Amino acid sequence: MAMSAPTVELMDYADVVARYEPVLGMEVHVELSTATKMFCGCPTDFGAEPNTQVCPVCLGLPGSLPVVNEKAVESAIRIGLALNCSITPWGRFARKNYFYPDQPKNYQISQYDEPIATDGHLDVVLDDGSVFRVDIERAHMEEDTGKSVHVGGATGRIHGASHSLLDYNRAGVPLIEIVTKPITGAGERAPEVARAYVTALRDLLKSLGVSDVKMEQGSLRCDANVSLMPVGASEFGTRTETKNVNSLKSVEVAVRYEMRRQAAVLAAGGAIVQETRHFHESDGTTSPGRRKETAEDYRYFPEPDLEPIAPSPEWIEELRATIPEYPWLRRARIQQEWGVSDEVMRDVVNAGALDLIIATVEAGAPANEARSWWVAYLSEKAKERGVALDELPITPAQVAEVVKLVESKTVNSKVAKQVVDFVLAGEGEPAAVVEAKGLGMVSDDSALQAEVEKALAANPDIADKIRAGKVQAAGKIVGDVMKATRGQADAARVRELVLAACS
């Protein structure tokens, strides 16, 4: 394992940005949502039993030959176009040579000096609404590696493990690696810029439909390169690469930590080691991994078993026409249509609820009601289950139906939550649940009047207070009636009946 600089006390962040200019470089690996692998016909299903989605090609057995997945090339071109890149008229695959157990061929088929897309940019919106442009150096295609599973250690890492197992299901899955040019000028906002960039890129890729971008499952993996140079200097410092940061929040935390750590090393007279570093989610720190290789170490050469990729101008223009409205422009348009604040819109986006709310509105629900259900109640249900919001077993159409049941006073808002819970439990459509469970609102005034009289008779002191003009005391009676009707009454109507009975 590479040895890093001695542990030192972290420098205060304000001192870091006063003395040093951070330089970032973001490398994002994206697994494409294709049915089969990059160079063979094996499926790409996540979570399959280990080593059940393999063949001679992705295992690198002698005599096997790769065939390019056209859908992966199409996705790569669309990503490049969405990132404002130039699409190469002549792209070539190359062999990246290195030995590691999760790489069965001892080389990875990637792209080197002739990538599919180059020289683009992505404008990202920061927390205060300002826009920061991140320049893209390249986007290139490659195949993913297998997965090492380290057994017997406390951390799940190789250090301390008794042995390692290898799962080659992931080997050969299509990847796009998107590499930025050095990101300068962010100053103290560098960690925020890093997080905002990955967020914007994730949203863009999802809108394109090329990946599910689930960081927790590894379909979007981020490496953050960080270096520091003294304020006013022009020569970049030595960089480190923090590998596989697997959440948006962690991207920001990892960059901030590495800036503080490097500044402390430099201030103590030490030197930064060019190395990879592991990010620890538990405490937000990084630790040394291995010395960082250079391109020469990989001994790239053209892949002899694959022809170059030469997309025609006509095909590129056809794909350009499929690029949807940018997510951030769409959000701004919808925010204006809804007339909500930046804060409300951030809550919607952070909850992953925007598309779900739009679909619920399209199904007939008012925007405010749709937003309330997805951002509040259903977000909590997703957290309880440990799933993403769009993985809950309820559709926008079903949420819209619940809203309509409340609007028509078939159920009240409290009972509506019970209806949603039954839908989440797989017990049927909302209206059918109301019918089967007897959850319809008690709307018969005579039945409600009887319950009001019972509650008043049981609480004569409160009845006297109401008659004396202390109408706020009616809340106790309303609560008793709601309890007696299992929450299935209209609380506003019950209150009217209570006040009328005491007048």
Swiss-Prot record:
Enzyme Commission no: 6.3.5.-
Pfam families per record: GatB_N, GatB_Yqey
- Report the gene name: gatB
Protein name per its UniProtKB record: Aspartyl/glutamyl-tRNA(Asn/Gln) amidotransferase subunit B
PROSITE patterns from the UniProt entry: GATB
Look up keyword Zinc and say if it applies: no
Q: Which family does it belong to?
A: Belongs to the GatB/GatE family. GatB subfamily.
Its biological purpose: Allows the formation of correctly charged Asn-tRNA(Asn) or Gln-tRNA(Gln) through the transamidation of misacylated Asp-tRNA(Asn) or Glu-tRNA(Gln) in organisms which lack either or both of asparaginyl-tRNA or glutaminyl-tRNA synthetases. The reaction takes place in the presence of glutamine and ATP through an activated phospho-Asp-tRNA(Asn) or phospho-Glu-tRNA(Gln).
Cited InterPro entries: Asn/Gln-tRNA_amidoTrfase_suB/E, Asn/Gln-tRNA_Trfase_suB/E_cat, Asn/Gln_amidotransferase, Asn/Gln_tRNA_amidoTrase-B-like, GatB, GatB_Yqey_C_2, Gln-tRNA_amidoTrfase_suB_CS, Gln_synth/guanido_kin_cat_dom
**SUBUNIT field:** Heterotrimer of A, B and C subunits.
Q: Which UniProt keywords apply?
A: ATP-binding, Ligase, Nucleotide-binding, Protein biosynthesis
| One Gene Ontology MF term | ATP binding
- Could you tell me what reaction this enzyme catalyses? L-glutamyl-tRNA(Gln) + L-glutamine + ATP + H2O = L-glutaminyl-tRNA(Gln) + L-glutamate + ADP + phosphate + H(+); L-aspartyl-tRNA(Asn) + L-glutamine + ATP + H2O = L-asparaginyl-tRNA(Asn) + L-glutamate + ADP + phosphate + 2 H(+)
Task: Please give the superkingdom of this protein's source.
Answer: Bacteria
Q: Name one GO biological process term.
A: translation
Q: Does the keyword Disulfide bond apply?
A: no
